[in-house]
């Protein structure tokens, strides 16, 4: 699903709202999540999951074309950890022994 499809679905479920307003709301929510992550904050949507940023330290890598070693600088990467309700909905009937951490 892409953002425009999400806007269409939300607008269809809420016929009292204009499509333009739904698009503005979706964009505002995504902008706020992005701004929070850019500030180093964690964004938790209870039951759905939590967005955060993790540091990927610098390392020595390899150029796949030439085989030469290259230095890869450290960087911050977005990370998403699923919430319990989302994991249960994706895996009905399974025990919740895994914490859903993709590390």
Curated annotation (Swiss-Prot):
One of its GO terms (biological process) is regulation of DNA-templated transcription. Belongs to the bacterial histone-like protein family. It comes from Allorhizobium ampelinum (strain ATCC BAA-846 / DSM 112012 / S4). GO terms for molecular function: DNA binding; structural constituent of chromatin. GO terms for cellular component: chromosome; cytosol. The keyword ATP-binding does not apply. InterPro entries: Hist_DNA-bd (IPR000119), Histone-like_DNA-bd_CS (IPR020816), IHF-like_DNA-bd_dom_sf (IPR010992), IHF_beta (IPR005685). The gene is ihfB. This is Integration host factor subunit beta.
């Amino acid at each position: 699903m892409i953002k425009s499809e999400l806007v269409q679905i939300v607008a269809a479920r809420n016929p009292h709202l204009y499509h333009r307003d739904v698009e503005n709301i979706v964009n505002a929510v995504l902008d706020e999540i992005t701004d929070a992550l850019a500030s180093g904050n964690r964004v938790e949507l209870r039951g759905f999951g939590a967005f955060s940023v993790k540091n990927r330290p610098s390392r020595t890598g390899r150029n796949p074309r030439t085989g030469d070693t290259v230095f890869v600088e450290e960087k911050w990467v977005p990370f998403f950890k699923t919430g319990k309700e989302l994991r249960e909905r994706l895996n009905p009937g399974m025990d919740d022994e895994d914490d859903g951490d993709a590390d």
